[in-house]
Amino acid sequence: SGDSGDGMQLAGNIFSTVSATVGNDISTFPDYPADIRAPQGSLTGVSGFQVHIGANKVFTPGDKCDVLVAMNAAALKTQYKFAKSTACIIIDTDCFQASDLQKAAFKTDNPIEEMGIKQDVIAAPISQMVKDCLAETGMDNKAMLKCRNMFALGLVCWLFNRDLKIAEDFLKEKFAKKPEIAEANIKVIHAGYDYGHNTHASVAHTYKIESKIKTPGVYMDIMGNKATAYGFIAAAEKAGLKLFLGSYPITPATDVLHELSKHKSLGVITVQCEDEISGCATAIGASFAGALAVTTTSGPGTVSYTHLTLPTT
């Protein structure tokens, strides 16, 4: 967990992919802040990604976590309640400065003591170590700090005895058009892994989960938005209609737009609009033209849609 721009969703997705690839069952729950452009370090701007992995069938994302990553003071303040009494907590001490603690409404300069945290805490200067790791890459400070999530991911991969090769392949594919970004992230993820190995960070909380090789072609990694997109395609096919999506990109609804845009060969038409009202308006127009038309929103757009409500007599 961390700020919206800390890349928690990406780190969670990569760890999920790594775990699924080695044969673990997974269930995930991405958690996005309700605020639009919440102030950095604020309590209302915390974003998180929950991953539940196991050797046997996993049915839910789980209630309490064994490992909690808090990239700043606000994340620790809001997410600590989800940590088990035996959990391991990872924090970036560079983001627990006086100003960070003030934003998170801490009253003292020792949040661990103030919250009465008894669990093991891996307190690492993640931000500084990332900058040291990438010092010779020529990247600016802002670009380097965007890799903080990969350091935390590398440390978590060490705790769970995960092979980094799968994570490397994921990053190379995601940043195929920007190989320098892929290499920077790969370098940092190894730095996080090595930090855990060299310092034996929280040896009491290393995990080994039995892996079971899955039969190729039988299983897939799917999230709710992707399943929703497939449902739209199936509904249009059964209705004998073309599928139209008018959408404004806004997290997390953007995933539906991204997925449907891949399936033009199946008669899917997607339009990216400048705002959510436009997205809804194009869908209404497409429905009058005979298409199965849908629009998406992460929530706030629902209010905007009322402006397009047609009066009836």
Q: Where are each of the predicted segments found?
A:
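Conserved AMP-binding A3 loop
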Residues: 299, 313
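Conserved small/polar residues in nucleotide/adenosyl-binding loops
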Residues: 306-312
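Short, glycine/acidic-enriched loop or turn micro-motifs at the edges of active sites
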Residues: 95, 250, 312
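Aromatic/hydrophobic pocket-lining residues that form π-stacking "cages" and hydrophobic walls in ligand
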Residues: 15, 282-283, 306
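Flexible glycine/proline-rich, aromatic-decorated loop/lid segments
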Residues: 45-47, 272, 285, 308
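Non-catalytic terminal/interface segments that mediate subunit docking, oligomerization
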Residues: 211-284, 288-296, 302
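Active-site cofactor/cluster-binding pocket
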Residues: 1-239, 303
